[in-house]
Amino acid sequence: FLVNIREPAGVAILEPKNMSQKAFLPISIVGPHGLDINDESGLAYVACDAGAVVVLDLSTGHEEAVVPIEGVPDVVWLNAKRHRLYCALGKPGIIEVIDTLKLVVDEKVNTEEGAHTFTFDRKRQRLYAFLPKSCRAAVYKET
């Protein structure tokens, strides 16, 4: 299991059988928050409150990249099939889409302020964002 640790900033790797800490991987950006893993590549994507996503190699502990984002993130979701990482920012109310090959933000999807919770349906390639101010859900389809 992986767990974000706020201070010192990093990712703890836990042994699933007894939840003991196997390793701690420090990162250079404060406030690790959202986290997703690409099991095939062994990379973790750590969205941090300081306005960046850290790409971390889990086998070496090395930071492969730091991708700037527009604000404080909440949830991230990896779409490994399309090489995209979705990162929700409740303020200003967007989902930033990071190209995980080029390691840049290549799209910004408007939601609404406060919308920081979403889920991704890998089979249907749809992203569902929950919009708390308007009491709705938005559906975005990958093409």
Kindly label every feature range from the protein language model.
Residues 1-143:
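Predominantly soluble domains enriched in secretory-pathway, periplasmic, or organellar proteins
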